[in-house]
Amino acid sequence: MKCIAIVSTICLLAAFVAADKEDKMLGSSYGGGYGKPAAAPAPSYSAPAAAPQAYAAPAAPSYAAAPVSIPAPPCPKNYLFSCQPNLAPVPCSAPAPSYGSAGAYSQYAPVYAPQPIQW
């Protein structure tokens, strides 16, 4: 048990020393690390700077702010066809409560397992 503790302590110490070496490589040839930032490039004086664009407010919308009211369509004529020689219009009303989207298929359909083939 003491041997495992000594070996793990040595490994931790070696990892700490290796990490400490990496911090001291600020000026190395691998990118410079976190040294001083590069100086800003000198401004170019070959042409005068363009004047900044003046701020222009956005144009007002061309549509009315209030929505246009659209009239409701007329109630359709529902005709009840029967064996009688006349057509009678059926008044519009709310649909009756039903089984929802299941409709007539609200029960599970029976599934029969086929008999295994005998060899």
UniProtKB/Swiss-Prot annotation:
The GO cellular component terms are:
extracellular region; vitelline envelope
What InterPro entries does the entry give?
Answer: Vitelline_membr_Cys-rich-dom
Tell me which UniProt keywords the record has, alphabetically: Secreted, Signal
Residue ranges occupied by any VM domain in the UniProt entry: 69-106
Its tissue distribution reads: Follicle cells.
What the protein does comes down to: Major early eggshell protein.
Q: Report the family membership.
A: Belongs to the vitelline membrane protein family.
Q: Tell me the protein's name.
A: Vitelline membrane protein Vm34Ca
